[in-house]
Swiss-Prot record:
Transmembrane segments: none annotated. It comes from Homo sapiens (Human). PANTHER family: CANOPY FGF SIGNALING REGULATOR 1, MIR-INTERACTING SAPOSIN-LIKE PROTEIN. Disulfide bonds: none annotated. Belongs to the canopy family. This is Protein canopy homolog 1. It holds the Pfam family DUF3456. Signal peptide: none annotated.
Length: 92
């Protein structure tokens, strides 16, 4: 959760979380992981993620129990209907 920053669009005032931290495969990752960030700004994202997991707990358990292939895509697009079906969700 600390890898994201809450940003507000100056025109629409829409708030979104943007990832600012590098991923493990990125060249700068080894240096970046030495740093520690803490902010209360990530709390809304954490709450949203926990709420989604709680809301779809039965579906998640069912998919895991069935050893479903492409679990991330199914969770994101079919079960929660939160993602476009063409998106690639390898991070879940």
């Amino acid at each position: 959760m600390n890898d994201y920053k809450l940003e507000e669009d100056p025109v629409t005032k829409e708030r979104t979380f943007k990832r600012f931290a590098p991923r493990k495969g990125d060249k700068i990752y080894q240096e970046f992981k030495k740093l520690y960030f803490y902010s209360d700004a990530y709390r809304p994202l954490k709450f949203a993620c926990e709420t989604i997991i709680e809301e779809y707990e039965d579906e998640i358990s069912s998919l895991i129990a069935q050893e479903t292939h492409y679990l991330a895509d199914k969770l994101c697009s079919e079960k929660s209907d939160l993602c476009e079906t063409s998106a690639n969700h390898t991070e879940l």
